[in-house]
Amino acid sequence: EYELGKDDSPDILFLGLSATDGVGHDNGPHSFEQLDNHLRLDKYLGDFINSQEDKLGKGNILYILSSDHGVLDLPEYLSEQGIDSGRISRAVRDSIFSITMKKIRSQIGNGKIYRYENFFYFDHSMNGAERKVATEILKEELINIPGVDSVVTKYELLKDGNDNISRRLKNMVHINKSPDIYLILKKYWTWTSKRGTSHGSPYDYDTHIPLIFSGGNKISKIRSDYIRSVDIAPTLARILEINYPKDIDGKPFLIK
């Protein structure tokens, strides 16, 4: 329909294989359901690749496979391996949230703090003293939620940190739009309270993703150097000899 590869101009086709995300959320990465999904996906991709190479010839197509995030193993699976892991009880969380908000209201009045999911926002009308009181109460109470590692302000996250975790936390903060208070979970813990799993933490299991460049007459090689997902676009631009803005986050890397 789109006549891909029919002329001298390169064509770029994006495919979102999103079922893998849903299956992983519901059943975990090591589940039989995910295994079945991967086996079927592998076959579908193989059929697709073969059909395209039959039309255009081998070596004329470059395939790039990656992911937008990793995932946490099921906490139950990790616990069986002797790893401290768990789910945040929604009932316990909501109870502590309720107690905390009542304490804050008793100190500074109503309509000053807003909660969205597990994040807390301060009303712009709050003065410095009110912010200090609210922050102290939030830190004192929310740390009692089992599985919470720390309760921090966005300004604390923006402080320089040399380790990967601090850098990742800092990168997720927008000074004007981000929550004022963050709850950082312990490693291997999740807000998913009943079943399945999730992602979104700064830990390696959530941030480490696969990246495969295949085809295009490239030599097979496994690399262990540090590459970021934002490096994919400028790398592809370099391969296609396309100009790209130099002030973007990503940097091209060599494919040998």
Where is each model-derived feature located?
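Short, His- and charge-rich active-site/binding loops that engage polyanionic ligands
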Residues: 181, 189-191, 196-200
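Structural motif
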Residues: 12-16, 64, 182, 212
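Active-site His/acidic residue clusters
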Residues: 2-41, 47, 78-79
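Substrate-binding rim/cap in mid-to-C-terminal beta-strand-loop elements of soluble/periplasmic
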Residues: 15, 91-132, 198-240, 254-256
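Extracytoplasmic/secreted cell-surface and envelope-processing proteins
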Residues: 23-26, 72-76, 130, 191-194, ...
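Surface-exposed acidic, glycine-flexible loop patches that form ligand/cofactor-binding
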Residues: 1-8, 53-57, 171-174, 202, ...
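Secreted, luminal/periplasmic, and some membrane-associated catalytic domains
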Residues: 32, 43-189
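Soluble non-cytosolic domains of exported or imported proteins
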Residues: 7, 32-39, 43, 128-133, ...
